[in-house]
């Protein structure tokens, strides 16, 4: 029997999470959540269980409220890179969850890399 869309998402999410646990080495995790309306990203220190920085399309200061496109995701990627530098994080690993690395997720990652984050 074929897997549903949700089951495939969970399968990808768990596969990615297990791979990242093996190669974490104390680095922060850049976690992305994408919905139909918004996109948000957090820089998480898993050793201490704290969020070091975050950015979301719901923040009025970024000027992308109500926009759900690749350009908005790129602005959020730039914002998280800037906030990560302020938090003293240069290197992290990218946790896309179960989301495919395409479109808005890819735009966010590329903008974060251009902003100076290494992953």
Swiss-Prot record:
Instruction: Please verify whether the record's keywords include RNA-binding.
Output: yes
Output a single Gene Ontology CC term carried by this record. cytosolic large ribosomal subunit
InterPro entries per the UniProt record, alphabetical: Ribosomal_uL18_bac-type (IPR004389), Ribosomal_uL18_bac/euk (IPR005484)
State the Gene Ontology BP annotations.
Answer: translation
Determine if rRNA-binding is one of this entry's keywords: yes
Q: Which UniProt keywords apply?
A: Ribonucleoprotein, Ribosomal protein, RNA-binding, rRNA-binding
Molecular functions (GO terms): 5S rRNA binding; structural constituent of ribosome
Q: How does it assemble?
A: Part of the 50S ribosomal subunit; part of the 5S rRNA/L5/L18/L25 subcomplex. Contacts the 5S and 23S rRNAs.
NCBIfam families named in the record: L18_bact
What's this protein's function?
Answer: This is one of the proteins that bind and probably mediate the attachment of the 5S RNA into the large ribosomal subunit, where it forms part of the central protuberance.
Q: Which family does it belong to?
A: Belongs to the universal ribosomal protein uL18 family.
Q: What is this protein called?
A: Large ribosomal subunit protein uL18
Give me the gene this protein comes from: rplR
């Amino acid at each position: 029997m074929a897997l549903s869309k949700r089951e495939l998402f969970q399968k990808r999410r768990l596969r990615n999470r297990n791979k990242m646990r093996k190669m974490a080495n104390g680095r922060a995790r850049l976690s992305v959540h994408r919905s139909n309306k918004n996109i948000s990203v957090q820089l998480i220190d898993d050793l201490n269980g704290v969020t070091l920085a975050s950015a979301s399309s719901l923040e009025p200061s970024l000027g992308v409220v109500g926009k759900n496109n690749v350009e908005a995701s790129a602005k959020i990627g730039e914002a998280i890179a800037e906030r990560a530098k302020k938090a003293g994080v240069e290197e992290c690993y990218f946790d896309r969850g179960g989301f495919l690395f395409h479109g808005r997720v890819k735009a966010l990652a590329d903008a974060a890399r251009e902003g100076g984050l290494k992953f």
